Structures are given as C-alpha cells and as structure tokens.
C-alpha cells in the first residue's frame, strides 16, 4: 500500500482529476487506516470492497482467516465511515463453500458484516492449486487433485453447498437481502 497505492492516491487527490474509482477486488483491512481511507476519498474512490472472507472461529483456528480479525475489520470500517463513506459505498466479500464450512458459519459471517454496517457481497469459493485451501478441498472430497481446473471451478460445485431443491440457496439470498437492506 505504502509503495504503490498511497503515492497514486496522493497524486490523484492533488490533481483534482474528475475520477470515480471502484475497488472490484477486496482490499486488505489491515492496510485501511484513517489516513488511507481519507486519502482514498480525496482521490475519488467511491466504491470500496473489503476482504472479510469469513468470521468463523473454526477458520481462524485452522489458520485460514488469520489475516482478518474482527477488531481489524471493525477498525477498517470505522476508518472508512470517518472518511465520509456510507454503508452504500462499502461492502465486504465473504466466501461461501469453503471446505468444512457450514451454512450457520456463513450466516454468522453475514450477520457480522451487516452488523458492522457494510453491504455483504458473497463470493463462491474456488480452490486454487497449490494453496492450503485446495488441499483441504481435496481432503474433504470436494474435488480431485488431478481434475481439469474447469471441474474444480465454483460454478460447477455451487449445488454442493445448498440442498438439491434450491430452497437453501433461496433462503441464503433472502438472508443476504435482509442483511443488506439494513444498511441502505
């Protein structure tokens, strides 16, 4: 952040260029300080997406989401709101369909993110070869190690997480919509 993003934001903020920036990928919450949030706002960043992934305790124990603690996430959100961003501007990506993840764990993460005042943006887990989560997905029988990557993609595995008749997915969408409507 300090090496690339901050100098870029400083240059944009000082130029008064009429830009509207959006972060389509989740930003790392540890890098979100009050100073950085204010600089982003001055530079023209209008849509901010944070990387939460999961707030489940079992993931933290397994060293998956050690990069984001609840306090760090709250601090990042507070920094953004203090800089002038609103709930409409800030969203958090959460992962759905991680090996061993329960629907209750996903719902807890939705509640946590919404409770922080941000929009919840679910993303389906897609294992990347060579990562710990890929190995966990193989061990859990979600994928086979030597399968074509297209067969490991989240698009083909979506039904694995929901019940077969689609009611589970529809209920999840209802939960997401209800959570997000609180922060409009």
Q: PLM features: what roles do these ranges have?
A:
Residues 94-95, 123:
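Conserved beta-strand segments of the P-loop GTPase G domain that flank and frequently precede/overlap
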Residues 89, 104-184:
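C-terminal accessory regions of radical SAM enzymes
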Residues 29-31, 99-106:
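Active-site glycine- and acidic-residue-rich loops that bind
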């Amino acid at each position: 952040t300090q090496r690339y993003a901050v100098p870029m934001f400083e240059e944009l903020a000082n130029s008064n260029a009429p830009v509207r920036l959006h972060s389509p990928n989740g930003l790392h919450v540890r890098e979100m300080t009050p100073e950085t949030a204010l600089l982003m706002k001055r530079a023209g960043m209008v849509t901010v997406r944070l990387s939460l992934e999961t707030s489940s305790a079992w993931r933290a124990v397994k060293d998956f989401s050690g990069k984001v603690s609840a306090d760090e996430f709250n601090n990042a959100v507070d920094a953004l709101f203090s800089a002038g961003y609103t709930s409409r501007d800030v969203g958090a990506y959460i992962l759905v369909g991680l090996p061993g993840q329960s629907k209750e764990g996903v719902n807890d993460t939705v509640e946590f993110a919404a409770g922080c005042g941000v929009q919840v943006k679910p993303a389906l887990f897609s294992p990347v070869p060579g990562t710990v989560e890929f190995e966990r997905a193989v061990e859990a029988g979600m994928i086979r190690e030597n399968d074509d990557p297209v067969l490991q993609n989240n698009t083909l595995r979506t039904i694995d997480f929901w019940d077969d008749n689609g009611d589970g997915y529809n209920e999840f969408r209802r939960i997401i919509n209800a959570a997000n409507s609180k922060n409009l």
